[in-house]
Amino acid sequence: MLKDTLVIWGGEFGRTPFGQYNSGNSKKPNGRDHFGRAFSWVMAGGGIKPGSIYGETDEFGWNITKGRVHVHDMQATILHLCGIDHEKLTFRYQGRQFRLSDVHGHVVKGLLA
């Protein structure tokens, strides 16, 4: 079943690699803030290379050091795995080209089986 099914869990932003503290309680972190530099997705089946990890951050989880992927690249990759050419989903509005993967999204071939 996993051969024909694409399973995805993730989001377009991660969380800061350190806890956030509020001013009233400096001893215990109360969570983590949104973090747009790095994010994690779990993907399985449907043409994804099994058992692989794509991309790396530095030892602090702050900067991407290898395999930078934009959310538009993820959208292009998901559409590709569903058999849809993301570049054909383009429409023009007020003189600009629009599509789900924006005009600079690319399929991340390193994720494909």
Locations of regions flagged by a protein language model:
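Ligand-binding pockets and gating/stacking loops
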Residues: 1-113
